[in-house]
Each structure stands twice: as C-alpha cells, then as structure tokens.
Amino acid sequence: MALRACTENESTHTHHTVNKQRKNSAPHPLQGKKTGAASAQAAKGGHQSAPRRFGRMKPVKAKWVTYGLGFLAVFAFFTFVYGDVIERAEQSMYISTAPETMQYLLSQPHGHLFYASRWVMLLCKWAPLGAAFLALVMTLTARAFDYAFRIPRSLRGIGFAVPVAEMAWMLSRGTNLYYKNEPSLIVLIPLVALAACAVLAALVALVKRCTKSTAPAALAVRPWGALLALLMVGGTAVTALKVNENVILTARFPNLADRQDWETIISEAQKAKRPTRAVAAYYAIALEETDQLLNHMFDIPYDFPKLQLDHFDGSEEYGLFVMDCNFHAGLLNPAYRAAMDHVVMNGPRVFAYKRMALCALLNGEKALCRKYLDLIDRMPFEHDFVERYSAMLDNPKLIDSDAELSHVRSLYPKESKFEQNYQQPSFLGYNVGLAQGSDRTLLTSAAACLYSKDMNAFLVRAQIMHQKGMPFPTCMQEAIAVAALKMPQALEAFPEVGKFVPDEVRAFLIDAKPYVEDREALRQNLKERWLGTYMYYYYTENNDPSQTRKDSEATPGSKAGVN
C-alpha cells in the first residue's frame, strides 16, 4: 500500500510538472498573431528562387535588352560614324533594269550576285535607312550565332562578335571599301553571314527537336552579353574615328560638295589632325567657292600621309579628287575626261555620270547632256537630280542662278591650249602656267603658285595684282617676304607688304634654326606657333623630295612639282 501511494504521488507530481511546462510554453494571444504573420511572410518568401539582386532580369527581358541595345549601337555606328561612307558607296555604283547598261557588271564573275546586292545597296542612299537595314541584319546574325553555339543566357550578345568582325573588315579596307571596288559588298557580306548563322541555328533547332531535350528551368540572369556587345561596337566606333578619320572625311566631303555645304567642309578640314591630299583638295574647293582661298589656304597641315589604296589604273589617290578639282577650276574638258576614264576603267558610277552631265551642260552639248541625264534617271531615287538640271538644259538662264555652276563659269580659261601643255594634275598645272585670265582666275593662279612654291611665277602674278590695285592677303605678304631673302628688291616692288611681316619671317627662321637638320622635328616643334603662315608651309610642309621641283624648271606636260 505504501509503495502504491508513493507511485501515485510521483505520477501526480509528474503530471503537474508537464502541465506547468505546457502552460509556460503557451504563447500570449498577441505573440501568437505576430508569430503567425512572421510564419506567413516566411512561407511567402520561400516561393522566391533567389533574393532580389541588382542587374538580374528574367531571360526574356534580358534577351530583348541585349539585342535591342546591340541594334541601337550598330545603328548609331552606321549613322553617325560611317554614315557618309555608306552614302558615298551608294553613289559609287550604278544600277538599272536596262541590261545594256549593266553588261559591265553582269559579265564579271559573280556579276548576277553583285547585281542583286546593288538593289539592296540603294537603301544606303540615306544613311539612317541603310544603317537601320545593316543593324537589323547584324542583330539577327548575332541572335542566330548565340542560338547555334548554345551561348549561356548571361552571355547572349557575344554573337555581336560576328558583326563587329564585319565592321572591322570595313575599317581595314578604308577607302578601298567602295573606291574602284564593288561597293555592294557592304551589304552582301552581312547578308551572307546572316544566312550562314541562320542555317547553323536551324540545324541546331532540328537536332534539339529530334532529341526532345528539355530545357532547364529559366532563372534570372545578368545580361553580361549586352555589355560585351556595347563594348565591342563602341570600341569599333572609337577606332574608326581615330584611325579612319581621313577615310570618313574623304567620303563626307564629296557628299557635302554635292549639297554645296562649303562651310562645313572648311570647318571640318581645319579640325583634321593630318589631312590627306583628297581632304586638302576638297578644302581648297570649298575655300575657292566661298572666295576665301588666299585667306585660309594654309590653315591646315600639308604633311600628307601615304594612303594604302589598291592599284588599278595608276591614278589611285588623285582619282579621288582630280575630277572635281578640274571642274571647279573651270576646266570642263579635263573634268569630263577624268570622269570618263573612271567609268571606262572601273565600270559605270553614278557620280561620274553626274559630273559628265554637268560638263556637257556647261559646254552647251545638249544632246550629250540628255544622254547622261537619261542614264542617271534609270537609277532609282535620282530623279530629283535629273529634274533639276533638265530644267537648266531647257532654260540656260537658270544656270546663272545656280551658285556653283555660275562660279565655275567665271573660271573658264581664256587661252586655247591642249591639256598636255600643262603640268599634271591639270587644275594645278593650268593655274601655274596660264598666261591670261580673269581677275578671279588670277587669284586661283596665285594660290596655285604659292602651293607649288614657284616663287618666280607667283611674283609675276603679284605684280599684276599690284597694278590692278587688288589687296594682298597675309599669305601673299609673307610669301613676298620669304622671296625677299634671296631677292631683296621684292620688298621695294610691293609696298603692300606690312612693315612687320619681314620681322615675322626672321622670327620664324630663329625658331627653326635648332631643327634645321631634322625635317620632322622642324615640323612638329614649329607647328603650334607657326601653322597658318606661309613660312611654315614653305619650309616644313609638302617638301618630300619626291614632291618638289625647282622654280619654273618643269617642262610642259611633266608631272613634276609640288602636288
């Protein structure tokens, strides 16, 4: 009995202890609500795959962002960086539905392929439209490449390496991209690359469908591929602006000249770091068209870099500008011949047809002009040009209202000589060697003599200007002071020379003395202070041994001289 009572007491004590513990562990009513809310929040958070982090996107959104940014980057490149290049390339071809006008192209290997791609190339007549097309093609290429090679979601956009490689090829070709080569390769190569990547992507999709493989669950990703695409395209753009500055200007200036935007040509040429001959030539044309030739002619450096041009007919670098320079010098027949030579040697080009049409118009050859206008009108989107100059053909008085054509008329030669009587190129040799001309021609002739460093011929023209009471720009005064170093009587013959100009020449010679044995050091160390003066040009620039000649020693028809 005693044992039973003891057991019952122990059991009762244990029961009370457990109940006390349960009572102590029971939550307060308010505490219970708070804990329940926390549990619900924890349960809700448990459905999230990962904590929210900066830069993570859903795969679909990341894909659109990546390829959208890539598209915009490529579009910006072909609009704002290489827009003038693709526009000039479009003008450097010819396309029509008339088989007889396309025989030159169709008879070549792959001619029919080039014929088809030239129709697509017409989109590049307007840089934004051509840029949009190229950006679309290149973006689709990048998408197909990423899919075909199973690029991870976070790196999608690395496929823009293919378009960037195409753009790098364009940069490496420079002016050769369209000059005397097939310009439609600009659109043909991207289209071929798209077709190749699309075929690979289709094969991968077919294999994937046959194997019935299931894709893993889509997780949020960081679109590193978008950053890579922007860096690649941006790096290409910076390279183009730095390395291919002259390539861009060589394409841009003829486009601006067609619109008669001379002031833009002048301002951009003066900003160029090291202009080529082509850039300097269009700069001179713009100065001449705005009556500023002798005032600003030497404001740019004339240390011409060597161009890497494909060799075809021997007129590689000069073929870029000699046609337009002859035209704007009033030499219509040499300009016409240069355009014709380009067509014969390199096939039909619409820009050459346009120049020949204008030469025929100004020469009064109406039938010939109509022939070229008809050829131009067969090419799509050129009707505005044809309509404008057809009106002048029917009413010659309209020519006088055109600033460019009336300016060219004012420079017509007044002496009858064959082109072979002058040094080449014609526009330079004619102005150095002419014996008579108008007052406007006298100015261009004086400028040509200064450029050629032919001081004897220059002094003859300066004497005529003195007799006519014409003002002497600063460069002419400096040139006379330079000539006076060997011919002191020159200063006495020209009272127009300011009294401080000879002092400026002597100051230049003092600065030049330490570098007289090193032509490159002479040029670089004196450039900051003296660029823009004739002394700097005469002693430091355009003085490569292969480019110089002694005053008045070149024989007629030779190619000697500074050019």
Predicted region positions:
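Aromatic-anchored segments of alpha-helical transmembrane domains
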Residues: 74-79, 161-174, 232-237
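Membrane-interface coil-to-helix junctions
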Residues: 79-120, 124, 128-129
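Internal/C-terminal transmembrane anchor helices
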Residues: 218-244
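Juxtamembrane "helix-exit" motif on the non-cytosolic side of transmembrane helices
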Residues: 82-89, 169-182
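Hydrophobic alpha-helical transmembrane segments
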Residues: 121, 125-143
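Alpha-helical transmembrane segments of polytopic membrane proteins
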Residues: 63-64, 103, 127-135, 183-198, ...
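Transmembrane-helix motifs of polytopic, lipid-linked glycan transferases
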Residues: 135-153, 167-170
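Soluble catalytic regions of membrane-associated enzymes that act on cell-envelope
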Residues: 243-417, 425, 430-456
